[in-house]
Amino acid sequence: MTNVKTNSIKAWLLAARPKTLTGAAIPVMLGCALAFIYGHFQLTPALLCFLFAFLMQIDANFINDLFDFLKGSDREDRLGPERACAQGWISAKAMKAGIACTTLLAGITGLCLLHYGGLEMIPVGIACMIFAFLYTAGPYPLAYHGWGDLLVLVFFGFVPVGCTYYVMAHDWNMSVTMASLACGLIIDTLLMINNFRDREQDAISGKKTIVVRLGAKAGLILYFLLGLAACWCCFYFLEIGKIYAVLLPQLYLIPHILTTQHMARIYRGKALNGILGETSRNMLIFGLLLTLGLIL
């Protein structure tokens, strides 16, 4: 894509990577479903949680774009979607300003949530912002040392699902824990396919992801097991009489198995970007099925 004017609206939209907002929406959606079934759902804090999640996702996208560019990780042989700074669509100076804006807006949204969740939400919000930077920035970028999967489990599982529920219910229970775990595992499939696709370039750049450390075959197996484990987590909901929350998510395994087989056939190269799209679709299917299962 060459017809992108530097620092234009189009450039910022591309840098924001709106397709990644699915991963931000699913945990909040599940937290809202849990609040609904326990009789605590409130529209205003729910909308604020969605807004905070979207702003933090865009913030993280900007941060990763800038610091991967500064570290030289976005090489010419990059297989994934084009990055704004590396392509010259957005200058490093402008991206820093963009990061400041999204961080500020997320902070303001977080302050609004304090009215519902209480002061205990302050350290959670601060942690979200700090780890958004530490993922690719700083002297020990966590994504470069194999911590990405754990961070996804925490910040796309327990934090957004649990805190969305908490700001409405001021409570935490085992249903929240299991939904958070399932959500974190399912969203980690997206990181796993990213790392599987980029394994050769990551090894050259010194990015020691789990796939780089354990190898491509292990990455393929882990990709499948993450989805399977997420479905297993749903069996907990039998304890609260939510049979549909057990059965409906199992339908996710059909596209997940097909995508895993497709991934194994392609194995390397830019064609794996198609698997990225399939994984995002499957992830949304799981989130919608579990949400529906909880509400029914």
Functional labels for PLM-detected ranges:
Residues 83-171:
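Intramembrane alpha-helical segments
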Residues 1-44, 48, 140:
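Topogenic membrane-insertion module of multi-pass membrane proteins
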Residues 239-296:
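Extended hydrophobic alpha-helices typical of membrane-associated regions
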Residues 26-31, 150-165, 183, 211-216, ...:
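Small-residue-rich segments of transmembrane alpha-helices in multi-pass membrane proteins
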Residues 55-79, 189-211:
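Acidic (Asp/Glu-rich) catalytic motifs at the cytosolic membrane interface
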Residues 76-116, 210-241, 280-286:
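Multi-pass membrane catalytic core of lipid/isoprenoid biosynthesis enzymes
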Residues 152-199, 217-220:
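Functional transmembrane core segments of multi-pass inner-membrane proteins
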Residues 29, 38-66, 122-130, 174-193:
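Membrane-embedded alpha-helical segments that form the functional core of polytopic membrane enzymes
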